[in-house]
Amino acid sequence: MKSRENSEAMTTSTGHTLRAEQAGSRRRLLPIIILVALAIRMVVVLFTFRGLPFAEEYLSHAQFGWEMGWIARALASGHGFSSPYYPISGPTAIESPLYPGLLAVVFKLFGIYSLTSGFIILSINSLFSAITCIPVYFSAKYSLGARGAKIAAWAWAFYPFAIYFSAGRVWEYALTGLLFTTCFCIAQRLHHTSNLFAWLGWGALCGVTAHSNPAVLSSVPFLLLLALYKVRKAGGRWLLNGALAMVALIAVLTPWTVRNYRALGVLCPIRDNIWLEFYADDFGNAPMDTSSPPSAEGRPYPASSPVELRKYLAMGETAYLAEKHALSLDDFRHHPHYAFLVIKTLRRIVYYWTGYWSFSAEELQAQPFTPENCFYVSCITLLMLRGIRRFWRQNRAALWPYLVLICIFPLTYYLTKPIMDYRQAIEPAIVVLAIAGVLPWRRIKL
């Protein structure tokens, strides 16, 4: 009897020791993955940062973040949140405030459009992308188990899109990816807690993320509803939890909404340029040709059209965007081109998930790596779909939050501009689903 008790005690002790060793191994592994990811991105930064401070007569320093860079320049030079295009102009809400504010701090400390500023901001982007390994790991751990989580984190460290869009581009991609993946990771587990501050914190974090890219707001209500459904099913305080999360979200969005109303006289939570996007990509002067690539020149953006820029400066932002709103609606009423809009939207969906728009000579001349990119993006999508199929069969409850991102988030871009840049907020979730699709079934916990 005593021998059996000793044996059980030894077994229990061994089990605790193994679990402790595994936990310690994971704690050591994640910092290693982050450091490797950062090192890879910093190597790329060394090759890209010198190309940022260039100047053309019209597109001056455009590579420094385009509209966000010009707003950051205005902030750093004392003109406030204004001037979304190269000439100094009035207040703006064309871009969300978080990343231009960060870039303005870099400009203030290291010089506007300086080589040092270019190196610093790309390094910060790279750090954000590397740290995204953390929510990727814990998101994958919740749905795939520890082994799948390790592989997903390593995959993100070496993922080409994650490297390119952080180390080579001055924009909010890496910041939004980090914040939104963290929101998603918390949303997967939110129903497990009855702590009201956790729900408040999640709502506030979603609000902060929206200040980086407001497109995430399309997915937030659905993620919240999924969590509330599980709380209600368990008999918890679902209504109070949901109300607190929404109150926190609205509280974070309200100050910038008030600022926009005072500065521009428009009621918009974050950005006011949605009708410019519709006008440029669906109506007005947009090419009425479904074969035109998404990057086609001649679209009426003030950033790339001197005529539109002069009009913007003469009319002011509010009147200019109101005109685009009126022109879009008028053109849609009188020349709706329904077939064109449907076909072009379908082509955008295909482009978003395959990278394919056209293999015409014009497109291949402008984008010589289009075939290779199509192959790569299509392979990722096929693996993602295979991962979705596996989840659907074995762990459907874990799949629903991923489906929210995959199905809801892209809708805005299906209707406007589906370039691969604007997929980066959900790219970490795509990677996790692709890992679920590529690994042998016996090696992941579904």
Segment roles from a protein language model:
Residues 115-119, 131-161, 177-178, 192, ...:
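Transmembrane-helix signature of polytopic, membrane-embedded enzymes
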Residues 31, 120-144, 182-186, 382-386:
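Transmembrane-helix motifs of polytopic, lipid-linked glycan transferases
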Residues 115, 119-120, 324, 330-402, ...:
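Membrane-interface anchor segments at the N-terminal boundary of transmembrane helices
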Residues 143-146, 183-201, 209, 227-231, ...:
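Membrane-interface transmembrane helices that cradle and orient dolichyl/undecaprenyl
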Residues 93, 97-101, 109-134, 153, ...:
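Loop-to-helix entry region of an early transmembrane alpha helix in multi-pass inner-membrane enzymes
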Residues 261, 267-352:
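Membrane-proximal stem/loop segments at transmembrane-domain junctions that anchor or position
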Residues 37-40, 125, 149-160, 178, ...:
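Short helix- or helix-capping micro-motifs
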Residues 46-55, 60-91, 98, 105, ...:
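Extracytosolic helix-loop segments that constitute the early lumenal/periplasmic catalytic or substrate-binding loops
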